[in-house]
Amino acid sequence: MSWFVDLAGKAEDLLNRVDQGAATALSRKDNASNIYSKNTDYTELHQQNTDLIYQTGPKSTYISSAADNIRNQKATILAGTANVKVGSRTPVEASHPVENASVPRPSSHFVRRKKSEPDDELLFDFLNSSQKEPTGRVEIRKEKGKTPVFQSSQTSSVSSVNPSVTTIKTIEENSFGSQTHEAASNSDSSHEGQEESSKENVSSNAACPDHTPTPNDDGKSHELSNLRLENQLLRNEVQSLNQEMASLLQRSKETQEELNKARARVEKWNADHSKSDRMTRGLRAQVDDLTEAVAAKDSQLAVLKVRLQEADQLLSTRTEALEALQSEKSRIMQDQSEGNSLQNQALQTFQERLHEADATLKREQESYKQMQSEFAARLNKVEMERQNLAEAITLAERKYSDEKKRVDELQQQVKLYKLNLESSKQELIDYKQKATRILQSKEKLINSLKEGSGFEGLDSSTASSMELEELRHEKEMQREEIQKLMGQIHQLRSELQDMEAQQVNEAESAREQLQDLHDQIAGQKASKQELETELERLKQEFHYIEEDLYRTKNTLQSRIKDRDEEIQKLRNQLTNKTLSNSSQSELENRLHQLTETLIQKQTMLESLSTEKNSLVFQLERLEQQMNSASGSSSNGSSINMSGIDNGEGTRLRNVPVLFNDTETNLAGMYGKVRKAASSIDQFSIRLGIFLRRYPIARVFVIIYMALLHLWVMIVLLTYTPEMHHDQPYGK
């Protein structure tokens, strides 16, 4: 970016220099106007001609001063227009650095404008025409009549100054950016004024010889030669000035074009600079990212260096180990024959042990299958006995309920008889009381009649005796009724006693039946206990067998790993060794045999593991069946007999593994639910087996559950619900 800053600084310096040149041109404008006013003042020139005609010294000094003035004007024009380049400064401008520096920059008057090419061509035509006409007129004026030298030189100087003034004006107008058509009209008018003034000067100079005295011919010829020489010099100088002005205008045009191009370049460079700034920002961001990536790569490089050092260390250790292995290689080669023989013996022993293990496993499987069949037969027998007992219990319960109903009916009848007996007894007591009262009243009446006298007493006695006979007869009748009632009561008592005895007998028979049933249940419980103990024993045996199988499997796997390591060592030895083709073929054949035997052992181990898993599942199913049988038989007299009709016994709904295939193959939602329950049960069984085999998993599960409960307790104890004080209905 330094080159762009330098270019911008150079462009700014160029603009400052152009402004300074325009300011110096403006400062020189007043001097040119003063010269023009002096040349146009004809009366003063005419008066001075009379005083200075014969003074050649002051006249020559005046001419030299005019020439110096023209040179100064040329220098100022050069300084104002060609101020772009540093090396193009004139000595006159260099002699006035203080003046150029002291002039302020007229920023308010200086306007940079682009000019069209036709305006520039018109300006060049005007300048060329203005250069030729004054010189021609001066020559004509000199050839006419030998006019005074001072006047002709003055007019020539004035005519030579006027184009310079016009050129200064046009340069100023071009430098300030005024319109070209107005500048051309002004230059034409000024040129016409100059022609008129030159004509007037010629006429005045032509009229002046009448008034001025005639000098000597020698002085005139000398002055005329001086004037001609001076006019020639002035013409040459004017031509050079015109050429310089044209070159300066061309330079100014070129500088203007270069300035426009520079401005376009500056604008383009500014746009490029903004783009480059954006690019630099993006590049800086990329550089930052790259520095971060480099830092990460440096860290990775450091890590890789550390790893490289570790790898070098490992390489050194590996080389040392390789040397040690190479030293051992010879020993291994020597011991190879012995190792092969030992390996063959070990392999034979291993095969023998494996055959023995297979034989023991087959025996255990056969014994387990036999035990399983016996146990299934026992279970079927127990199931049949349990069904028979259940049927007998139901019949006994029905008989007991019938007898209980009969006893209740008899008790109701006894209660009715007792109530009737009580009512009859109460009636008898009431009747006895009534009879006693009647007898007492009769006896009182008899006594009162006995105390009476005469015949009347006899009649009354006969009447009373008759009444007494009637009462006795009634008494006899009441006694007979009482005896009948007493007989009925005795009969009812005897019937009640008979019924009570029959009820007692039936209750005793029912108790005996219940006792028999309880004895049978106790026997079933004892048999179930025996079966449970036998099942526990079988479980323990199976557990021992499983542990033995697991141990044998681990030992076989460890031996297989050892054999694999030995095989790998042998392979490495075979790769490192350069044996003959026969020995290599023998080793390859042996290696193939060992790999085949290894594959066979692995397949056998997989089959054993699958058989073991199936046996575990069968054992767990038997356990669940025993649990279901124990749960169904422990209910006593209140047994659920809903499954007797189907002949399958009671099934617990929460043990889905016990469902038969016919039950699981049922169509509809019931079969789907049973299938899902059985699959969940199998998964739970497998999970339990996994946790039983691997205690580390159990520990992790326990830790996880403890942490989960702890977290839940912490959340429940530390949670505070948010209190929303907003109004209801979302207000």
Curated annotation (Swiss-Prot):
Residues 134-146, 189-199 have a biased composition (Basic and acidic residues). The keyword Disulfide bond does not apply. It is a single-pass type IV membrane protein. Keywords: Acetylation, Chromosomal rearrangement, Coiled coil, Golgi apparatus, Membrane, Methylation, Phosphoprotein, Transmembrane, Transmembrane helix. Residues 216-632 form a coiled coil. One of its GO terms (molecular function) is small GTPase binding. Residues 173-188 have a biased composition (Polar residues). It is found in: Golgi apparatus membrane. Residues 93-222 are annotated as: Disordered. InterPro entries: Golgin_subfamily_A_member_5. One of its GO terms (cellular component) is Golgi cisterna. The chain crosses the membrane at residues 699-719. Highly phosphorylated during mitosis. Phosphorylation is barely detectable during interphase. Residues 2-698 are cytoplasmic. The modification Dimethylated arginine is found at residue 89. One of its GO terms (biological process) is Golgi organization. This is Golgin subfamily A member 5. It comes from Homo sapiens (Human). The gene is GOLGA5.
